[in-house]
């Protein structure tokens, strides 16, 4: 079933946040108007924004989803709000398994894939803990704290696969495709949980064009349940919890690798990463024991030197 188009969104904002939104819209030549019970209303193209005196911000129009996701959430609210409005809708309370990964875009460290089983009581507990998409939690310490709380929730089952660099590189050598590795990993953590609990369905964030990338790796138990892959699946509590579990495991394993190497191994694929890779080479340490070798960064250290 296709996702329902989002053309309206409401959230609470402070006076300062409303002023920040107003300034943003003014700079982009929105037309302002008077609206009953509101400080202001503004419109341009396919977007209408109204700041009510009650503290509510109303966003309407076909551009609602894009504007909320790319400006309002990251720049003003500093948290995810779109997709969480129906957080206690019936489908959020159904028994299911959520799956997510961490480390795919990081040069150093493992690829981690986690699955989490939830039901109604577990979801309500996750809501109280403050579970949300791990990408919206900037502090590694906070990720660690929430991950511990998730594992303490009665009945909440977790499974994790951490493909350390050497293992990851061997798999990539065979599969030659990151999505194939992800498909195998997602299927594995799903099957592992299904051996411990009966769940009618599973959901994961969409990383491939078709669900077949995962389904072809499923075994007997996995083939019997509903499986859904969709964009922004982290708005689902089960997937959000899996994203936190995966991120905590990734950060912990990356830290261990750094300790082993005797240097700090940064996240991502920035200039700091290149400097750390150069340090590993200088120390005569095998790069494939610390990094994902198909990244372009590796070409700087594995390609033969050009001849004069």
Language-model segment annotations:
Residues 1-303:
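RNase H-like, Mg2+-dependent phosphodiesterase core
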């Amino acid at each position: 079933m296709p996702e329902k188009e989002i053309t309206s969104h409401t959230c609470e904002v402070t006076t300062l946040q409303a002023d920040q939104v107003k300034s943003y819209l003014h700079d982009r030549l929105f037309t302002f108007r008077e609206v009953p019970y509101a400080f202001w209303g503004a419109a341009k193209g396919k977007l209408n924004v109204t700041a009510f005196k009650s503290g509510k911000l109303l966003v309407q129009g076909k551009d609602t989803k894009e504007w909320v996701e790319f400006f309002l959430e990251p720049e003003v609210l500093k948290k995810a709000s779109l997709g969480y409005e129906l957080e206690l809708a019936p489908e959020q309370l159904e028994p299911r398994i959520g799956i997510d990964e961490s480390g795919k875009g990081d040069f150093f460290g493992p690829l981690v894939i986690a699955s989490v089983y939830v039901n109604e009581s577990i979801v309500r507990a996750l809501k109280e803990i403050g579970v949300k998409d791990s990408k919206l939690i900037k502090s590694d310490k906070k990720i660690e704290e929430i991950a511990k709380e998730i594992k303490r929730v009665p009945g909440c089952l977790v499974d994790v696969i951490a493909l350390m660099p050497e293992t990851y590189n061997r798999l990539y050598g065979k599969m030659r495709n990151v999505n194939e590795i992800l498909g195998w990993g997602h299927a594995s953590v799903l099957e592992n949980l299904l051996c411990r609990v009966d769940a009618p369905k599973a959901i994961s964030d969409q990383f491939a064009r078709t669900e077949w990338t995962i389904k072809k790796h499923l075994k007997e138990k996995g083939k019997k349940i509903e499986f859904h892959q969709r964009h922004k699946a982290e708005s689902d509590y089960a997937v959000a919890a899996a994203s936190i579990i995966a991120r905590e495991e990734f950060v912990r394993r990356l830290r261990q690798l750094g300790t082993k190497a005797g240097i700090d191994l940064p996240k991502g694929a920035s200039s700091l990463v290149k400097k750390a890779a150069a340090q590993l080479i200088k120390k005569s340490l095998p790069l494939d024991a610390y990094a994902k070798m198909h990244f372009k960064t590796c070409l700087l250290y594995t390609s033969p030197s050009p001849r004069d």
